[in-house]
Amino acid sequence: MNNLNNLRRVSYKDFEQNAFNPTWSGWKTLIEIEKKLKPSKYYSDPISHMYLFLNNYWLEEAVRKALDLSYKSNDHMAIYDYSGLNMPDFVDDNGVTYELKQGKSLESLELIAEKDWHGCKVKLFYSRMDKCLYSNAGGAFNWHKLCSLDIKHINPDKGLKLKDIVL
């Protein structure tokens, strides 16, 4: 694994506090990091792309707290200058691994390749439509609702754009 201390990074807490501040000094680093990441399927604007990362952080934090899980790796508190690890997101006290995905609805599950679950024991899926977290510990479509979660969210279409940022 990469030594995270030697990488450029922006903490999610700093990003959260400055997400609508066009003069924030962290934008320069975020834009440099975004250039090294896999391009967004949804947004060509780098700032819109970065809002997706912040939204995902808020979801991961809510799930971690709701299910009393720990992060499997130490790369979940900041956006780093490298691609993520191919391992599950979470682990519980018994060593059971969990991977979290999200989509508009349960129908979105059809778009997630098995390899993207990273060999986890428990699959977690957050449906943005009904704001519910589901789990599947086996079986093709054996999903069970765990809980409702109202997650903070920035609509990237309504946030800042690169043209708004003062570098």
Predicted regions: what they are:
Residues 1-66:
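Interdomain/boundary linker segments immediately adjacent to catalytic/signaling cores
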Residues 14-17, 49, 95, 119, ...:
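Intrinsic-disorder/low-complexity loop/linker signature
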Residues 45, 73-93:
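Active-site metal-binding core of divalent-cation-utilizing nuclease and nuclease-like domains
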Residues 57-82, 104-106, 131-133:
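Nucleic-acid endo/exonuclease domains
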Residues 67, 90-102:
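Conserved catalytic cores of phosphodiester-cleaving nucleases, focusing on short active-site segments
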Residues 87-88, 94-95, 119-124:
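Short, surface-exposed beta-edge/turn micro-motifs
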Residues 100-149, 153:
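Catalytic cores of nucleic-acid endonucleases
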Residues 150-167:
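Charged phosphate-binding loop/patch that engages nucleotide di/tri-phosphates or the phosphate backbone
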